[in-house]
């Protein structure tokens, strides 16, 4: 270990920055975040530093560096493009035992400034010892994604209760366990979900009622898993997936996402395949209630977004009636994910000024929709769960005035490495789907925007599964074929 990691208190303490350019500005900004008293010595200042001087946020010595400038400084940073001057500042500070940093010259540094994650009062510093600042920034960005901004406010809450808890629990070991139980459970989760007042109430109650939070009731996390690609999960979704005691998941959640769930969590498959519901919806609702009443943290994991054809409303309605705490985490809905990964913008000023989401789910062999509304021009219609009802969808749209040549796309396993896009028309799509043995999950997009797929498609999976189609000058499909199978239709 070439550098010892340490955090310095610089509030109201005198620090010196040698240099007045953009590099010096970055260092001044860091010092000001720590509430240091900053003096800049430089014949000239960049506009941003000049603005700070104008409002007395920094002191400026408008001249060259002099040895006496380091007197009474607790920290010095050399940020000039004069290597001889930088070296002189370093040697001078070293002789006087003043911590010194020379930008981009680690061999001249008594200390280095790491790449930082600021969740004040929480701070995380990442350093490569000056060997690779770029790598340090990359590592910081990865770590940063796992530390929500609310952790800073949570730390401030804990700080506010430290003395009170210490007085109530004088034993060090018992006090540690108290904080562990709270921060690994209800207080943190309430805080992260924006219920900060409830978090304070829980903390107060824990202090008043025997200090034990193990009898706290469970909670349900209704989480949207997105369309399939794990990289499209939200930070909050991933955090709750790692926290859950039990997971109730559907068929539409991709295996790659299931792999990210906490390893020792109990897994309950709820099914939701067409006509094969392992658990009826009412039983799922009651299952969530029962598990939460057992004190478990229950992850209800759904493909896409739980409030878009996901029956999330039905589930939380039951939870509300039973008084079960819950939180809802939105996911990228299949329409947004599959369209984006297929190069099909759902709205476009030249083609569509509206987009409609509809369910293509069959009920008693038919699809009960407002077909007149869906047949309106200059809009895009997206059908969820429409594979089995595809012939009915095409027939009804044409019967209500939509041209048989209207472009149509079917996206299979969208956003994953197995994504396949079949492009045709209302007239041709039913036969194309038969030829390519399409399997769910699928999404259907109807509208002029589908014409843009061939030009805008950007996502190229490891194996090219795109079914290409060629449009005539009138927008009609004249040929469709799979690049993997060589079939034609």
Curated annotation (Swiss-Prot):
It catalyses: uroporphyrinogen III + 2 S-adenosyl-L-methionine = precorrin-2 + 2 S-adenosyl-L-homocysteine + H(+); precorrin-2 + NAD(+) = sirohydrochlorin + NADH + 2 H(+); siroheme + 2 H(+) = sirohydrochlorin + Fe(2+). Its EC number is 2.1.1.107, 1.3.1.76, 4.99.1.4. The active site is at residues 250, 272. Signal peptide: none annotated. GO terms for biological process: cobalamin biosynthetic process; methylation; siroheme biosynthetic process. Pathway: Cofactor biosynthesis; adenosylcobalamin biosynthesis; precorrin-2 from uroporphyrinogen III: step 1/1; Cofactor biosynthesis; adenosylcobalamin biosynthesis; sirohydrochlorin from precorrin-2: step 1/1; Porphyrin-containing compound metabolism; siroheme biosynthesis; precorrin-2 from uroporphyrinogen III: step 1/1; Porphyrin-containing compound metabolism; siroheme biosynthesis; siroheme from sirohydrochlorin: step 1/1. It holds the Pfam family Sirohm_synth_M. CDD domains: SUMT (cd11642). Residues 218-489 are annotated as: Uroporphyrinogen-III C-methyltransferase. InterPro entries: 4pyrrol_Mease, 4pyrrol_Methylase_sf, 4pyrrole_Mease_sub1, 4pyrrole_Mease_sub2, CobA/CysG_C, NAD(P)-bd_dom_sf, Siro_Cobalamin_biosynth, Sirohaem_synt_dimer_dom_sf. Residues 1-203 are annotated as: Precorrin-2 dehydrogenase /sirohydrochlorin ferrochelatase. GO terms for molecular function: NAD binding; precorrin-2 dehydrogenase activity; sirohydrochlorin ferrochelatase activity; uroporphyrin-III C-methyltransferase activity. S-adenosyl-L-methionine binds at residues 227, 303-305, 308, 333-334, 385, 414. The keyword Transferase applies. Keywords: Cobalamin biosynthesis, Lyase, Methyltransferase, Multifunctional enzyme, NAD, Oxidoreductase, Porphyrin biosynthesis, S-adenosyl-L-methionine, Transferase. NAD(+) binds at residues 22-23, 43-44. Then it catalyzes the NAD-dependent ring dehydrogenation of precorrin-2 to yield sirohydrochlorin. Finally, it catalyzes the ferrochelation of sirohydrochlorin to yield siroheme. HAMAP family: Siroheme_synth. In the N-terminal section; belongs to the precorrin-2 dehydrogenase / sirohydrochlorin ferrochelatase family. In the C-terminal section; belongs to the precorrin methyltransferase family. This is Siroheme synthase.
């Amino acid at each position: 270990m070439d550098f010892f990691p340490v955090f310095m208190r610089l509030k109201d303490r005198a620090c010196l920055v040698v240099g007045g350019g953009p590099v010096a500005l970055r260092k001044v900004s860091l010092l000001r975040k720590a509430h240091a008293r900053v003096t800049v010595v430089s014949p000239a200042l960049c506009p941003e530093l000049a603005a700070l001087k104008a409002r007395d946020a920094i002191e400026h010595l408008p001249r060259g560096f002099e040895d006496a400038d380091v007197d009474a400084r607790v920290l010095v940073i050399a940020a000039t493009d004069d290597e001889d001057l930088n070296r002189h500042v370093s040697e001078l500070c070293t002789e006087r035992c003043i911590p010194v940093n020379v930008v981009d010259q680690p061999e001249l540094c008594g200390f280095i400034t790491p790449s930082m994650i600021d969740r004040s009062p929480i701070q995380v510093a990442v350093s490569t010892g000056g060997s690779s600042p770029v790598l340090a920034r990359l590592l910081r960005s990865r770590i940063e994604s796992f530390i929500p901004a609310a952790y800073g406010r949570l730390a401030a809450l804990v700080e506010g209760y430290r003395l009170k808890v210490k007085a109530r629990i004088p034993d060090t070991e018992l006090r540690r366990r108290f904080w562990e139980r709270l921060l690994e459970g209800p207080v943190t989760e309430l805080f992260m979900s924006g219920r900060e007042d409830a978090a304070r109430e829980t903390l107060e109650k824990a202090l008043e009622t025997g200090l034990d939070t193990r009898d706290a009731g469970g909670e349900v996390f209704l989480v949207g898993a997105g369309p399939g690609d794990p990289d499209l999960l939200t930070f909050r979704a991933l955090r709750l997936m790692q926290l859950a005691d039990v997971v109730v998941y559907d068929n539409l959640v991709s295996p790659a996402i299931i792999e990210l769930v906490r390893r020792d969590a109990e897994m309950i498959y709820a099914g939701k395949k067409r006509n094969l519901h392992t658990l009826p919806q009412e039983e799922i609702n009651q299952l969530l209630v029962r598990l939460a009443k057992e004190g478990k943290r229950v992850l209800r994991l759904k493909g896409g977004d739980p409030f878009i054809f996901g029956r999330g409303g039905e589930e939380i309605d039951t939870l509300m009636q039973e008084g079960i705490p819950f939180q809802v985490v939105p996911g990228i809905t299949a329409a947004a994910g599959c369209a984006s990964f297929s190069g099909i913008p759902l709205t476009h000023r030249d083609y569509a000024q509206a987009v409609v989401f509809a369910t293509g789910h069959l009920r008693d062999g038919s699809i009960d929709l407002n077909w007149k509304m869906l047949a309106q021009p200059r809009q895009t219609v997206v059908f969820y769960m429409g594979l089995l009802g595809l012939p009915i969808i095409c027939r009804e749209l044409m019967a209500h005035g939509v041209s048989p040549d209207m472009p149509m796309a079917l996206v299979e396993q969208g956003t994953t490495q197995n994504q396949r896009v079949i492009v045709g028309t209302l007239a041709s799509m039913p036969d194309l789907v038969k030829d390519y043995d399409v399997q769910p999950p699928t999404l259907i997009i109807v509208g002029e925007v589908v014409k843009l797929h061939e030009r805008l498609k950007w996502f190229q999976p490891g194996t090219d599964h795109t079914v290409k189609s060629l449009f005539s000058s009138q927008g009609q499909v004249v040929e469709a074929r799979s690049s993997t199978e060589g079939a034609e239709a």
